[in-house]
Amino acid sequence: MTTDIIKYNKKSPGNRTFLFLLSFVCFSNVVGQDLRLLDWKPKSQLVVHRTEITHPKFTVIDIHNHLGELQNMKTYLGQMDQAGVKVVVSLDGHSHDDFYKEHLKTSQSFSKERLLVFFAPDWQRIDEPNFGVNEAKRLEEAAKLGIRGVKVFKSLGLTIKDKSGKIVPVDDPRLDPIWQKCGDLKIPVMIHVSDPKAFFTPVDQYNERYDELAAHPDWSFYGNGYPSKEEILAQRNRVIAKHRNTVFIGAHMGNLPEDLGTVGQWLERFPNFFVDIDARISELGRQPYTARKFMIRYQDRVLFGSDTEPDAKAYSVYYRFLETDDEYIDPAEGHHLQGRWMIYGLYLPDEVLEKIYNKNALKILNAAVYK
């Protein structure tokens, strides 16, 4: 059959074009067999302006950080100096086995003013009598030692179970004394519930984070007895509404950066609710017009966070995103690759930048009863 095509092709220039295209398709198919989609990492041919920013326009308070190895505190301070970061809040002050005391002691030995620590309640004790009251007492003791806030990890409402085998909801009344105590002490609750929307949808050809979920199957919370993302967020919102005197900071843009319209509605509804941008510039930067309008409108309610160990190179990606109008920025160095897209800078006004970088955080942190 190939011989017939070649003979026929000699008689007609138009058919020579057809043969070339047919050969190209066949060649492409052969090459494609050697490249998996997960291995495909195309390099853009765009030539666009790149602004190099190593220092922010205003000093930074990173209110969402994880300091990791405590012996690296000196290195972290060096990275902070290099990146113009004045204060970092570590969210790793776990109350289990009183680990927060070690974290506090180490942090304060290097810099009491620059390395702050939040307290993470021990949900494993949920079945103990008077758990909430007792944990609230431990929190007050921790605040007297220097703890400046509370951190809620995503396991609450998602994987933590009590002795009945049921998942403990975020708005479980047993936890009310903890939220109330935060209000009394005037310390914030950094609350992370649920995860990206894609992690709660089927892992199929329509999932925009398929490659991540294929590499990390445990990141998927679709089905298998997990509550829906919507239900978890509703639980959190009921807590915020019930405890109006307590400040809640919604980690990762309130855990719904894919829908800033809804996040804006929450901010309108709950005056005690704030959000931070940590590890979500990949979501914000693919909707730059909407994100810019959001940041300007809610400039008094947005905080800066990175969600990583202090790293000057990672901070520079955040600064470039917030301060410039650069196009097609690779967000991966700011945290890790989240989705197969690049982002666009928001070029925020200086008065907005200063609030996001430090002023909003200062108001919250400086309100604490114990400092």
Language-model features: locations:
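H/E-rich (His + Asp/Glu) clusters that bind or coordinate divalent metals
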Residues: 224-225, 229-371
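Active-site gating/metal-coordination segments in enzymes
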Residues: 34, 51-53, 101-220, 271
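Alpha-helical scaffolding within the catalytic cores
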Residues: 45-48, 71-76, 97-107, 133-138, ...
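N-terminal secretory signal peptides that target proteins for export/translocation
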Residues: 1-14
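An N-terminally biased module of ancient metal coordination in phosphate/nucleic-acid-related enzymes
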Residues: 33-113
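Hydrophobic faces of well-ordered beta-strands that scaffold small-molecule active sites
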Residues: 61-65, 87-90, 115-120, 150-152, ...
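Acidic-and-aromatic substrate-binding clefts and catalytic sites of carbohydrate-active enzymes
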Residues: 65-74, 92-100, 124-133, 160, ...
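Bacterial N-terminal signal peptides
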Residues: 18-29
